[in-house]
Amino acid sequence: HFDQDHYYGLIRVLNDPSFEFGKIYHNGLPRYGFNTGKDLNLGTLSSSSGGGPRSITTELRDLASAQTLLASGLLLTENHNDNNFALFLRAALKASNEGRLGAMRMLVKRNPGGTAKILSDTGPDCSIEVLAPVTTSPTGPIRLRAFHDPHKVTATAPFPSPTESHTINGNSIVLRLRHGNKEFLFGGDLNQPAQKYLAEKYAPANPFSAEVNKACHHGSSDFELEYLKAVHPCATVFSSGDAGSYDHPLPDAMGAAAKHSSGEFPLVLSTELARETDSKGKIKLMGHINARSNGSTIVMAQKKEKPSESKTWYTFELPYAGPFGGH
């Protein structure tokens, strides 16, 4: 989805002629510019009559629609310059025109009760299933649920006004990678109302179980316990920067992840302290998290901050049986 921490760094990569790409997948929600009249800066909301949940249009599809959006003048800043999303689209079009990008595609799930949606460019030994975003209807115009801040919910207002951040994050692309008989879940920036919505859409099925769970939204407190219980992983990975005002991952997210994991020794791995800069500006990378699978066994590894001669990584085979292997 088009939050800056998920796409802005790719602009430089897309503009680099030494890189080639197959497809760019996205959730269909563009980031409009200043004073365009677009709801939530994302699209057009459905009517709010009745106080129920609302939906929003999807207005980005392929590279042709990207070109149309750029020509519309709706992706400009207050100073009439391209906003960051426009810069991303221009970089994608440049890569396409140079033969370095194959396609841009919107990725959604239309019928949660239907057959699994598997990305076409994955194979039988390693497949990627698309679980979200789930459209509000299996047919007709492609609209997504507009999500609210759960802190604003009251007994008389179960669906308060949706917000830009909860809607863009809540409609993250969610993927489950299956390698052999092992599964990895990637939940993007899903939040609590989105996780509840997905549970309702898929009920009574549970497509979210996985041995390894990439924690949603870098370890935010905005999560639904029932979602964590449905995933029930052996290991959870939190990916977040060391700086910033959000202090992710938060203690409740890490604690809940451990409590609702499987096994006596659930693993919670975090990239929070991932690098160090000395007085000369030299960056030393550490705390890297690595997952390896042969289809029947998964090994998680975390790089030591100060590797010894005999050991660079801490390694854990899943399900982890503890430091003494049950002996």
Feature annotation, model-predicted:
Residues 1-14, 213-226:
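Di-metal (Zn2+ and/or Mg2+/Mn2+) metal-binding site signature of metallo-dependent hydrolases
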Residues 21, 232-238:
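Proline-aspartate-enriched helix->loop->beta-strand connector
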Residues 7-187, 191, 259-267, 271-327:
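Flexible, acidic/histidine-containing loops and adjacent segments that form or flank the divalent-metal
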Residues 9-13, 197-201, 223-231, 252-256:
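A short acidic, amphipathic alpha-helical/loop segment
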Residues 7, 246-248:
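Conserved alpha/beta-hydrolase "acid-adjacent" motif
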Residues 198-203, 207, 219:
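Nucleic-acid-processing active sites and adjacent nucleic-acid-binding tracks
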Residues 3-5, 30, 191, 216-220, ...:
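Catalytic metal-binding/acid-base residues of hydrolase active sites
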